[in-house]
């Protein structure tokens, strides 16, 4: 038999999960009830479009000090909410941006999309959910690398030292091609950003940006649609998304979310499946020990896919248009082409390419467009180069034939580990004119290599294009991929040892 105290406790628990009807309650704000299991009720300010409350399974998840919103908040917007059948749509309009939120009856998901005609004045386009860090302290999948709570700043205002470890919101990043879901979580709740559409973002398949950051007061869950963070492309206008914020109690949600209902919600810029086409074909010629990626882009959209082990591929559903088509070995471009996509049809297009070099005396690393395997590359994505967990940067000496790849640094800093010395042995038939080809992935502040071979000093190359963005200290390695060829005159290389 239950005591009165036990009975009251059970009734209280049950009351926290009982749902009202699917719908909108209107006052100074719109209160949206999703009518979902483990109930989801959220509140949107009618003047600003800020989400000011998110109650999931009876618990307030929203940070009380500041709302969740697009950019740094719209300030003021024309905000409306409508219910049609099984769907609710919230629309927030300014002169240059429209933010949409969509909810389906019974689902614990806030679907969103952002339509722009100009880049926001803050210079980047992002959605940030500011959530209660007491309830949702953890970040997934990379953990504490981006938890900067109580940290001491060591670089700008975005890299911190916490309990002897360097941390930054940038260390939460993942390549776009691999980032379909990132989450923050606690013992009773998990909130995930599900990303199934990058078409209007910028940067290509290997771009990466901030995903989450527990800064102490609140835990931020982001979707960065574009930014100047090591950005290689111009920004695209139009509709960004759909993207979805999924609420659960424990399990990690699937990334397979159907947002085709957006076609019925009068979303500016939304192109339904019927208005799209695909590209199918076979890629060939690249080194099969690496992943192969095919990438399509133009001024309006971008898409990508991994190929199968045999090289076959089918693109995502693409908006009609003519696209540059790129074939990568890892992240290294081996071929480019062009293809035109038409609505309602599949276009056949094969692509072939490989790395072409002359007779090679020595090679350090692989043709994959990444610093994988070089010293500190395994840590660089998740910590600052100054971190005590990093191996000694040098200066280092690499001896061809006996050194391991980790004896060569993944980055060269002028005041830290320059020069890097390479020793190699040449035969008599290798003493003619040669080319030392140095392939880089990223530069900063005009940094570029100048080589000396024995007594010959190569000319200083011109400065690379300035990305105007910190990279290697914020977990990035991919830039324009500048290549520097040093012409080595005949007789410079000698039989025997060379440096």
From Swiss-Prot:
Disulfide bond annotation, renumbered to this chain: 49-92, 183-192
Pfam families: CBM-like, fn3_3, RhgB_N
Purpose: Pectinolytic enzymes consist of four classes of enzymes: pectin lyase, polygalacturonase, pectin methylesterase and rhamnogalacturonase. Degrades the rhamnogalacturonan I (RG-I) backbone of pectin.
EC number: 4.2.2.23
Gene this protein is translated from: rglA
PANTHER family: RHAMNOGALACTURONATE LYASE-RELATED
Keyword field: Carbohydrate metabolism, Cell wall biogenesis/degradation, Disulfide bond, Lyase, Polysaccharide degradation, Secreted, Signal
GO annotation, biological process: cell wall organization; pectin catabolic process
Organism: Aspergillus niger
Cellular localization per UniProt: Secreted
Family statement drawn from the similarity comment of this UniProt entry: Belongs to the polysaccharide lyase 4 family.
Signal peptide segment: 1-20
Entry's Gene Ontology molecular function annotations: carbohydrate binding; rhamnogalacturonan endolyase activity
Name of the molecule in the record: Rhamnogalacturonate lyase A
Gene Ontology cellular component list: extracellular region
Catalytic reaction equation(s): Endotype eliminative cleavage of L-alpha-rhamnopyranosyl-(1->4)-alpha-D-galactopyranosyluronic acid bonds of rhamnogalacturonan I domains in ramified hairy regions of pectin leaving L-rhamnopyranose at the reducing end and 4-deoxy-4,5-unsaturated D-galactopyranosyluronic acid at the non-reducing end
